[in-house]
Every structure is written in C-alpha cells, then in structure tokens.
Amino acid sequence: LHFLLRRQRQMCIRDRDADGRKIPGKVSEDCLFLNIYKPKNAKKLAPVLVWMHGGAFKHGSANEFDGSVLAAQQQVVVVTLNFRVGAFGFLDFSKFGSEYLGSASNGIQDCILALQWIQDNIEEYGGDPDNVTISGESSGGTMTLGLLGCPSAYSLYHKAIACLSLIHISEPTRHTSI
C-alpha cells in the first residue's frame, strides 16, 4: 500500500461535541485538503471512493477515516476530504447583502471543489476519473444526498452511497443556486 499523506492536516474550525466538550486536535481556517490512499502495484486505473466525514455538520475531519485497508484489500483509491463545518460551512449571511447569496452552502461548495480536483488529478494517483463513487456517514451521508441534487456536481461522480443519513426536507425561504 502506498500512503500519500505526508502529515496530519488541521481540522476545520468546529463546534464542541454533543456533550459540550471541546474536541481535541488542531483547527484552522486553512483546512480544505484531501487524504489519498491508493493500492500498491495497481495494474490499471482503480475505482475511486470519495469519503465525506460525519459530525452533524458541526465537527469532523477527513483524518477520522483511514482508507489504507480498503485501498489495499479492494484495489480502490480512497479519498477523504475536509469541508467547512458549523458557521463557516453553513451559516446564511445573505441578509447582510447580495454579495453573500449562497453563503449557507460553503460546505457543499467545498465538496464540489474537491470533486473537481479529483476529476482533474486523480489519474496521477492511479484513480479512474470515470469511476468515482461519493459516500459518507451521518452528515457525510447527508452531504452525499445533497450532492445528488446539485447540478454543478452531476458530472463529477458516477455513483453514490449514503450511510446513516438523515435528511429533512422543508419549504425553502429562498432558493440558492449551486
């Protein structure tokens, strides 16, 4: 197995856990990164699994999932990604001016940007850009379902697996184009 991560990156700024305890680990606004795990000695381009972390959209990190075993045993390139959480990822600032329209979708935009990077670069890591599956658990599963509804993401993945996802559908107060 070839593990490409050179060092653990910082997590996105986040809330405390459900019990109000501070979550350990270093945080930063400079937190958008990918971890890439690839099988060793692959003979052809491997399918790509993009994993989005859980954490109630308030905490979580790409570092929480080690894709090395999956990559080695299933001959798949595993990509874990960070996206902004809490207020940095999902707070709506549009009431402060039209320049902030869409601000409540920063976390989704982060995932779309990561998927664009994967499409453009994953072949360099042995991954097949024409065989990308998006997946996640808990809020990562909800993010997976959210990406199914984003026209700008349609060409960036080919399959989706949502694990333990909860989605609440309500009448939106405003429509945001993503």
What role is predicted for each listed range?
Residues 1-9, 13-15, 167-178:
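Single conserved hydrophobic/aromatic residue that forms the stacking wall/gate
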